[in-house]
Curated annotation (Swiss-Prot):
This is 4-hydroxy-3-methylbut-2-enyl diphosphate reductase. It is an enzyme of class 1 (oxidoreductase). Dimethylallyl diphosphate binds at H41, H74, H124, S225, S226, N227, S269. The active site is at E126 (proton donor). Keywords: 4Fe-4S, Iron, Iron-sulfur, Isoprene biosynthesis, Metal-binding, Oxidoreductase. It comes from Francisella tularensis subsp. holarctica (strain LVS). Pathway: Isoprenoid biosynthesis; dimethylallyl diphosphate biosynthesis; dimethylallyl diphosphate from (2E)-4-hydroxy-3-methylbutenyl diphosphate: step 1/1; Isoprenoid biosynthesis; isopentenyl diphosphate biosynthesis via DXP pathway; isopentenyl diphosphate from 1-deoxy-D-xylulose 5-phosphate: step 6/6. NCBIfam families: ispH_lytB, PRK01045.1-2, PRK01045.1-4. The gene is ispH. Isopentenyl diphosphate binds at H41, H74, H124, S225, S226, N227, S269. (2E)-4-hydroxy-3-methylbut-2-enyl diphosphate binds at H41, H74, H124, T167, S225, S226, N227, S269. Pfam families: LYTB.
């Protein structure tokens, strides 16, 4: 059996920035270092940081006053920011800059008393943070996951309406919902460029290009990773067996029975070393050759948070 490796795959610029932020903060600050929510949705990465002394918490209420705290890549609501300020925390914000961009759009809608429609998955931390940017008493923010949800909405002022999306959704599915929004509300405003992040788009594009060449897909990523699940879905929608794994021990020989080509990709929060471990495990259970599948080359970089750059002396605080 042959293995085809999707390109690009694995860590995106936002995840790299978030993980590097935690590792650098561990170097410049005294322990313990607290992180609100899993810094990225990958069990291997989180477990590794725990071993280095990071304490993960669900809410800033669990963090002692004046302690060091990091916000995860998914972003937080205004209420969480205010709670952190009251506790006088030494705060490092590892929110992905692309999520921050979505936050700005929602805050602008709120400031203009525009109603806002957010396309996203209920309960996802990014969605909670984005919903929490809206403060207008005259308007409201609504969460929808499908065109069916859209049909149930009652909008008070269609001429003062804005939409935004979670950054890690399916590009194809979201495009359909956005088009339905524009058809129903012709005057709706939204971001100049789609909120779906470049890395999510690129990884989905790479999978689509590879589908006609494979008969099974293994996606390296954790079960709670939204973008990893979307990669798996692209294959299953085409009738191709697909599996989501974040531990080499989870690889099952039966997956590859009577298969000729296995595609391997990784969600934006999965490190390359884990990809290589899983490829090695696949090779153990069935003889394989490994080939890189040509794709988009990513060269995006997001700088570290300003406070951290100041502490380590690699940049100026503006």
């Amino acid at each position: 059996m042959k293995i085809l490796l999707a390109n690009p795959r694995g860590f995106c610029a936002g995840v790299s920035r978030a993980v590097e932020t935690v590792e650098k903060v561990l170097e410049v600050e005294k322990s313990p270092v607290y992180v609100r929510h899993e810094v990225v949705h990958n069990k291997v990465v989180v477990d590794s940081l725990k071993k280095k002394g990071v304490v993960f918490v669900k809410e800033v209420d669990e963090v002692p006053d004046d302690a060091v705290c990091i916000f995860s890549a998914h972003g937080v609501s205004l209420k969480v920011e205010e709670a952190a300020a009251k506790k006088n925390l030494v705060l490092y914000d590892a929110t992905c800059p692309l999520v921050t961009k979505v936050h700005r759009g929602v805050r602008l809608a709120s400031n203009n008393d525009a109603e806002c429609i957010l396309i996203g998955h209920k309960g996802h931390p990014e969605v909670q943070g984005t919903m929490g940017q809206y403060r207008s008493k005259k308007g409201a923010i609504y969460l929808i996951e499908s065109e069916e949800d859209l049909n149930k909405l009652t909008i008070k002022d269609p001429d003062n309406l804005y939409y935004a999306t979670q950054t890690t959704l399916s590009v194809d599915e979201t495009h359909g919902i956005i088009q339905a929004l524009k058809d129903k509300y012709p005057n709706i405003k939204g971001p100049k460029k789609e909120d779906i992040c470049y890395a999510t788009q690129n990884r989905q594009t790479a999978i689509k290009a590879m589908l006609k060449h494979i008969d099974v897909l293994v996606v390296v990523g954790s079960q709670n990773s939204s973008n990893s699940n979307r990669l798996k879905e692209l294959a299953t929608l085409e009738g191709i067996d697909a599996y989501l794994v974040d531990n080499p021990k989870d690889v099952d020989k039966l997956w590859f029975d009577n298969k000729k080509v296995c595609g391997v990709s990784a969600g934006a929060s999965a490190p390359e070393y884990l990809v290589q471990q899983i490829i090695s495990q696949i090779s153990k259970v069935c003889s394989t050759e490994v080939e890189e599948f040509e794709g988009i080359k990513e060269e995006v970089y997001f700088p570290l948070p300003r406070l951290l750059k100041q502490k380590i002396g690699t940049g100026k605080v503006e």
